Amino acid sequence: RITEMIPERNEQGQTLWSKMNDAGSDRVMVSPLAVTWWNRNGPITNTVHYPKIYKTYFERVERLKHGTFGPVHFRNQVKIRRRVDINPGHADLSAKEAQDVIMEVVFPNEVGARILTSESQLTITK
């Protein structure tokens, strides 16, 4: 198929494919230049399906064009960073400290609300 559609040499006389058999298979050897030639001179098909394939990309571009970015909040970075500075290397955080860091990262707004004991939890739910 390739040999029917792509010439053996391009305009500069560089070989695009040769009739020498590829070792171990009965196919012709094709140069990477053939791809370039095809991209430049190959048949042009309709581009209707591109948006379908790159749907997410196109949608994202559209969103970015019309997008507004709300206020971005960075909270509690300092606290966590300081904690990391105090424990350099692989000194493991104590279970409690690890819990604190996780809580700070996962629930940034709840910082300072200590993990409630089951009793106080009960009274609240009551």
From Swiss-Prot:
GO cellular component, one term: host cell nucleus
Membership in a protein family: Belongs to the influenza viruses PB2 family.
Keywords: Cap snatching, Eukaryotic host gene expression shutoff by virus, Eukaryotic host transcription shutoff by virus, Host gene expression shutoff by virus, Host mitochondrion, Host nucleus, Host-virus interaction, Inhibition of host innate immune response by virus, Inhibition of host MAVS by virus, Inhibition of host RLR pathway by virus, Inhibition of host RNA polymerase II by virus, mRNA capping, mRNA processing, Viral immunoevasion, Viral transcription, Virion
GO biological process: 7-methylguanosine mRNA capping; cap snatching; symbiont-mediated suppression of host cytoplasmic pattern recognition receptor signaling pathway via inhibition of MAVS activity; symbiont-mediated suppression of host gene expression; symbiont-mediated suppression of host mRNA transcription via inhibition of RNA polymerase II activity
Protein localization: Virion; Host nucleus; Host mitochondrion
Function, in words: Plays an essential role in transcription initiation and cap-stealing mechanism, in which cellular capped pre-mRNAs are used to generate primers for viral transcription. Binds the cap of the target pre-RNA which is subsequently cleaved after 10-13 nucleotides by PA. Plays a role in the initiation of the viral genome replication and modulates the activity of the ribonucleoprotein (RNP) complex. In addition, participates in the inhibition of type I interferon induction through interaction with the host mitochondrial antiviral signaling protein MAVS.
Record's protein name: Polymerase basic protein 2
Pfam families in the cross-refs: Flu_PB2_2nd, Flu_PB2_3rd
Covalent S-S links between cysteines: none
Subunit structure: Influenza RNA polymerase is composed of three subunits: PB1, PB2 and PA. Interacts (via N-terminus) with PB1 (via C-terminus). Interacts with nucleoprotein NP (via N-terminus). Interacts (via N-terminus) with host MAVS (via N-terminus); this interaction inhibits host innate immune response.
